[in-house]
């Protein structure tokens, strides 16, 4: 058996490692997992087929797999105060797919946040499986505040009388009132599902309200702010447990990825610590520090600021450049972010009027408020003065900041 990584793969791996070490990562959905999670992702568990659930497998030799998955299930339930947990979904999208299957029939009506307002593809976008399987109607944000308008959401729900309401977003920077969503759902007898993929780590840390208190089903990814192996997780009330499990296997998936389930379990255990609670608090502090610097230097923030881990910046109205161009400028100096639509955007999705910035990854590396103030000033300078001389100077500042907060020093491929 070959024991060496292919030379071309090794070369790319080492270049990617160097990129991660030397760049400031501000993509809101990215993070740096612990070396324990990395090790588990590449463990011998990848060899094992384990269709089914702990104690009810369709393959032999699963006793140790069962131990790990059972630990993950129990940890998820305790961490999020859930009656039931399924940690097998391969992704957040597949978690959402299974949640829909557990609650709905094809063509049932759903009300969710529109993609242009900050929602997600799996919340009914027409060319996504969700959009062509179910009958979605959408709510957005108030045009003046760019925040959720619960009175307007209630009117939309009363008009369309959905079977399911989806709360949650991929680009919304304010606290979501899950209690209010539950009250609205109850008025039409609808189920409430919350997609907390972006904020799960903040919920675990106690710095964002826990949707499990109000929702029938909660879905999430296990990476992003939760800082785990890539994958999905479903939490629900006990009355939906059987339907959820059946919707995942055999409804949506076959064999679970037990190496990633081990990585998820490790991350859930890490998220149960006091250290992680402090991490969650620091994410929010860092976001506010970055937001303040950007605002003080004339950049307009969508919704007026942030309560969580991300900031949506309206680049077009303040600097007359697209989000795509801003993304490329920042990447040229070693700051990685993504172009992003903003509410009521007039630009096409490939160009956008905004960029989305997130603090989780660099908070993992040890950045605090002072470092994020520096990052904010670098961003402003790069976008306002795109001269080669200035960008070269700023790129050196980025490298200097990264060198003060090293990551994965012991890894070499």
From Swiss-Prot:
Cofactor: pyridoxal 5'-phosphate
The keyword Transferase is assigned to this record: yes
One annotated GO biological process: glycine biosynthetic process from serine
Catalysed reactions listed for this entry: (6R)-5,10-methylene-5,6,7,8-tetrahydrofolate + glycine + H2O = (6S)-5,6,7,8-tetrahydrofolate + L-serine
GO cellular component: cytosol
Localization of this protein: Cytoplasm
Database matches in Gene3D superfamilies: Aspartate Aminotransferase, domain 1 (3.90.1150.10), Type I PLP-dependent aspartate aminotransferase-like (Major domain) (3.40.640.10)
Pathway connected to this protein: One-carbon metabolism; tetrahydrofolate interconversion; Amino-acid biosynthesis; glycine biosynthesis; glycine from L-serine: step 1/1
Similarity section: Belongs to the SHMT family.
UniProt name for this protein: Serine hydroxymethyltransferase
Gene: glyA
